[in-house]
């Protein structure tokens, strides 16, 4: 576990925003979420932080979102999880916050394309020329930002996720020459998001 730097004040937006995406603060994030999950219902913590973290779920190969969602998925039906399960939720949220990384562009959902059409406008990258971590260089990739911004507003979150997973499953099948792990995550992360939808404000979608 990384050493703590200094506590994150969850009520101070300037402070916690400066720590988003800073993995060296992962332990600080963990302590913040542990504290909040002791003081508040876990559903309320997700409702508060979900809209903040969703735009940056791409970071850490989407593992923050996936870990958080699967922690919730394993909660008992009476929604009264054990201390160990609550701590796993805190760890998932902390990893998500520490690896927070939004995609380039401003996906304000004012575009006109569904996800499958937007995919057709994405530029192609030679896997052999990819350097650095996954996603490195996307800001400078011609056409990528405009493709992200071309997405239309989703009127139904569940349907939008289904469209997304189906579209990227098609990409995975159509391109066996591409390393599969990144593409698999474009399917598994949105699918995992289904577990959090009941606690995310609908206006986010």
Label every PLM stretch briefly.
Residues 1-205:
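Mature, well-folded catalytic/scaffold domains that follow N-terminal targeting or propeptide regions
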């Amino acid at each position: 576990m990384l050493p703590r730097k200094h506590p994150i004040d969850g009520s101070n937006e300037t402070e916690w925003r400066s720590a988003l995406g800073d993995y060296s603060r992962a332990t600080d994030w963990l302590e913040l979420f542990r504290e909040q999950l002791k003081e508040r219902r876990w559903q309320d913590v997700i409702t508060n932080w979900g809209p903040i973290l969703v735009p940056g779920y791409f970071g850490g190969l989407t593992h923050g979102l996936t870990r958080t969602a699967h922690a919730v998925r394993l909660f008992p039906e009476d929604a009264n999880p054990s201390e160990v399960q609550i701590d796993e939720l805190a760890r998932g949220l902390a990893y998500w916050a520490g690896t927070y990384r939004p995609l380039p562009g401003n996906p304000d959902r004012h575009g006109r394309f569904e996800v499958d059409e937007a995919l057709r406008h994405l530029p192609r990258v030679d896997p052999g020329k990819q350097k650095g971590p996954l996603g490195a260089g996307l800001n400078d990739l011609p056409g990528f930002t405009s493709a992200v911004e071309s997405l239309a507003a989703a009127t139904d979150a569940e349907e939008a996720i289904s469209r997304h997973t189906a579209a990227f499953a098609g990409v995975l099948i159509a391109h066996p020459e591409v390393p599969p792990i990144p593409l698999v995550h474009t399917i598994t992360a949105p699918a995992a998001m289904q577990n959090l939808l009941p606690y995310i404000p609908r206006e986010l979608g």
